[in-house]
Structure formats: structure tokens, C-alpha cells
Amino acid sequence: MTTACISACARSGRVAPVSQRVSTPSLEVHKIVAGVWRHVSYQHLKKWGWFPSNGLIVETSAGPLLVDTAWTTEQTRELLRWVQRRWNRLPVGVVVTHAHDDRLGGLQVTGSVGITTYMTKAVADQAHKQNKSVPRLHIISTPVVQVRDVEVFYPGGGHTANNVVVWVRRARVIFGGCLVKSAASRGLGNIADATLETWSASISKVARRYPTARYGVPGHGSPADLALLDHTRALLTSWCSRHRSRCGH
């Protein structure tokens, strides 16, 4: 995989370890496979310090498509500048995978330049309940739908009740978002809006629907293969064994 860092880290040719960063880290763009990139943005969290969040840039027949914005407005502006330099145009749309800031924190930026937002009604409703603006909204009305050249699939609740995953068939890349944990994860992370009783079943639906996936991209952390799904289920099993009432047992 190749990596591009915007602004200062592009000039230095390297990325400082997260623990050494003082100012907000620059956006990073990592090539996964031909036509698919992972964008990585950061937010400072009290418990973990500077914490990375993943989204995708997918080259489609209509032009570049974003899966989730960057975490902040400024990093989303950086993301749009990267796309503009690469394709000499703005993205044709942004698919939002759930209604947390690490997925839609830059929607005001994308909306201000006319980029269409694709999300399910459930995600849109949740965003509105949180008083988040959703500009240029196009509602995804079915559990499985094609958006440009990608498939958006709602497998059931997990990290949130309304999280979706995105399948890039030609590249065999599945973007699991925060439904899927990275191999380095040792816990479930933020479960404030989780539906713990259905999460494992939702992971199983993703595994059955996309058995040929070569790359799995979690919401946070490094991509891997479909072993990420097994790892997520194992984390759920461990957590639920200690909190049985929270998991519907």
C-alpha cells in the first residue's frame, strides 16, 4: 500500500508517531488497491489521545466517491483538495455509514460545494435528532442499494442501530466502518449507541454476503482481511460473557 500525507507530513516524508503529535495531525491518504484509497483523519480523545478514523475514496465510472467524510471540517477540506488535485474535480457524492462525527463531521464542507450526501433514512433521522446538518440529502431507501459503483448494505444493528457497510466489488474491498474492529482492537470502543444483542448476527450477515472480500477496512485502525470479522465476533463474545444482561442473555 502507498501512503500520502497532506501538508507538513508530505514535506517531511514521514508521519510522526501519534504520541509525539501536538497539533492536529494532517489528513493521510493510503492506497489500498487500484482505484481505492483509505483516508485517515484524527480527533483528540480524552482516553486515547489522537485517534485515527478511516473512510474511503473510490474511483467510480462517474468520478471519485467518498465513503464518510473526514472527522473535522478542516480535514474534510484537506480531503477535497486531495481529490481535486488527483481528478481535477470534486467527489460525486459521499456515503455516510452512521451518524457519529467520525463519519459525518465534514458534511457542512461537502454540502457547501454541492456534493450529494447518501445515507439511509435511519441515519438521517439520527443525525437530525443530534441537531446535525445533512445538506443535499439523498435517502437510501432499501437494505441493499447501488450508489454509483459501490453497494451499500444494512446488515442490522451493531456499533449503532443503523450502521451500514460498503462493498467495492471490483476491488473486493469491504468497508465495515465502526461495525468492524481492527486486529489491534482489544475492546468494543464506544458502545453508547450500540445494539449489542444483534451485533454478532450483523457481522455474520456481512461475512455471508461478501465471502470473496480480499480487504476489510474497519472504522478505526489498519485494514486486513475477513479475519477482522472473526476478531470482532470474538471481542463481542468476550464482552457479552462479562455483561450478559446488556447482550440480551
PLM feature segments, named:
Residues 228-249:
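Binuclear metal-ion centers of metallo-dependent hydrolases, dominated by the metallo-beta-lactamase
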Residues 62-65, 74-118, 211:
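Active-site metal-binding motif and surrounding structural segment of the metallo-beta-lactamase
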Residues 35, 58, 68, 83, ...:
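Divalent metal-coordination and catalytic microenvironments
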Residues 10-23:
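Short, low-complexity, disordered segments immediately C-terminal to signal peptides
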Residues 24-27, 31-32, 63-65, 71-72, 113, 118-158, 162-227, ...:
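Metallo-beta-lactamase
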Residues 1-12:
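N-terminal export signals
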Residues 31-80, 164-178:
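Conserved beta-strand hairpin/beta-sheet module of binuclear metal-dependent hydrolase folds
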